[in-house]
């Protein structure tokens, strides 16, 4: 294998791991068979895959203009795909949640959960309700998420935080263990393990 093949191999490895990440971060969508939402979430990676495949053709062109146009088209494509990959209401809700405007986040997540009853939207609603101090409503939203997808670990994690805050240590410990055993991103699993040690 010559040195010219190294960038191509590295690019295809990047694409492979990017697709793995898409499916690991969106396992709930696969379990819910929400293929349209999954494709939408995968848009940046679809563009990245097209970019990698087109590299095989474009690298044969020596003209600088072709390479520049190719790069500009795909940078614009990735930016546009990234923008389109998340519904506007979800972006607004996430921004509101991060800045501590929980009322706005609750309203947006509630609308999302009503329009498309996915476990993630109910869990996000539960997190916003919990952050806003609405404990029972938060638990109800987390329960609804778990009805949609019993493997959605974030719902267990959110519910555990509410139980912990309400000093229901036994329930919190059970939900933290369930969160660890379920489909949960690594950073939340680590946080759940740490909280479980503190709770027991």
Language model region names:
Residues 98, 131-132, 165, 195-198:
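Register position in tetratricopeptide repeats
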Residues 111-114, 143-147, 178-181:
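Conserved structural position within tetratricopeptide repeats
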Residues 116-117, 150, 184:
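Short coil turns that delineate tetratricopeptide repeat
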Residues 121-122, 155, 188-189:
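TPR alpha-solenoid repeat register
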Residues 124, 158, 192-195:
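Canonical tetratricopeptide repeat
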């Amino acid at each position: 294998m010559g040195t010219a093949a190294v960038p191509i191999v590295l690019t295809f490895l990047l694409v492979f791991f990017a697709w793995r990440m898409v499916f690991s971060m969106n396992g709930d969508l696969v379990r819910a068979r929400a293929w349209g939402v999954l494709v939408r979430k995968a848009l940046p990676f679809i563009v990245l895959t097209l970019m990698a495949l087109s590299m095989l053709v474009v690298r044969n062109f020596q003209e600088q203009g072709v390479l520049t146009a190719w790069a500009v088209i795909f940078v614009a494509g990735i930016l546009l795909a990234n923008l389109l990959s998340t519904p506007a209401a979800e972006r607004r809700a996430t921004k509101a949640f991060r800045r501590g405007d929980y009322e706005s986040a609750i309203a947006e997540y509630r609308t999302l959960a009503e329009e498309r009853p996915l476990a993630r939207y109910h869990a996000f609603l539960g997190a916003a309700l919990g952050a806003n101090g609405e404990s029972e409503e938060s638990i109800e939203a987390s329960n609804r998420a778990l009805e949609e997808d019993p493997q959605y670990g974030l719902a267990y994690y959110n519910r555990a935080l509410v139980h912990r805050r309400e000093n229901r240590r036994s329930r919190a410990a059970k939900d933290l263990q369930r969160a660890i055993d379920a489909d949960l991103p690594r950073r939340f699993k680590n946080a759940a393990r740490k909280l479980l040690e503190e709770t027991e």
